[in-house]
Amino acid sequence: MSARVSNNLFESMRDAGDFQPAVSGATLLAAIFCCGVLAGTLLLAGFGILLLYKGNLIFGLPVIVGALLYRPQLGKAPRTVLPRSACPTLYRLADDVAAALGIGPVAGIAITGEFNASFAQVGWRRRRYLYLGLPLWGILQEDEAVALIAHELAHGVNGDPSRRIMVSWAINTLAAWTDALIGGAVTAIFAPVPWSGLVLLCHLLAYEQQKSEYRADYLAARVSGTAASLSLLDKLHHEETFGRIRRQAHTQWGNPDIVSELRRQVMSLPAREMERIRRVQRLADSRLDVSHPPTAHRIAVLQANPTLHPALQLPSVDLEQINRELAPALAALRQQVLTTRRWIVVQ
């Protein structure tokens, strides 16, 4: 999506505050296109069956195998999730936030080593999974932790078209076919076909995806309060700091506990430097990730549409207890850094 369109959307969301989902012409075109992708996969399978019926095993069998291997996927659950019995406080918080948003509890919470968090719905039953990046989680205060979980779970109710079953099918199918075709010397000439379809689909969805991100921010603010959501967005500015710490940890004999080191640097960051980081972010016209508006735009929209009384009135969020429950995951991340660093040194 162009910077001009992104800026127009930002001004509309900031000034009008229209956070209700709506079906646009681009969304309808995307839905029709997704149906075409599914129909094309079914036709390919039918063509393979026809070839087999006529006795052409050489071409028929590969066509059917390809149609089966690259059929529409519904996503996969994370390989490892935190057991509820081991992290009851974290799950209780996630369940409370989900209830405030009007959705069911998550099926599981997975931990990553990234400065990020995400939400996924997988399988025919669309089971919900929450992914929490330990580096980001490690620098949050109690209200910011609530805002983070609320924002991610809000992706289940914010009307994002890319999370609908048919759209997910089409995106995964086109991506799989592109990867499969581009790897062969002969088939590579056909790779631009599914790749072009993927680019077109992403272009059709970009506007509503960014609008859905604003809606997720707004829904999260209704749960945790605008102040908490703004503070959380401010913490996202430390992604570059984390990247530098991680690179140093993997190549130098520094602190392998990248979460603690990030927390220390964030806490000791001078106000002047933090303001410089904010100013750089505000000057950015757009981001490479077309599904997310610039952080500065998200902050401005929330400031223009404040929620003074959050829906979730928790007596207290025992963040220390949650972090104690996450201690084994932190230890595993530290060991992963040490293992990678030793491998680099040996090489």
Tell me the role of every PLM-derived stretch.
Residues 6-30, 136-139, 144-168, 213, ...:
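Membrane-interface, cytosolic juxtamembrane amphipathic helix immediately N-terminal to a transmembrane helix
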Residues 67-169:
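Peri-catalytic and regulatory segments of divalent metal-dependent proteins
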Residues 158-192, 230-237:
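Post-HEXXH active-site segment of zinc metalloproteases
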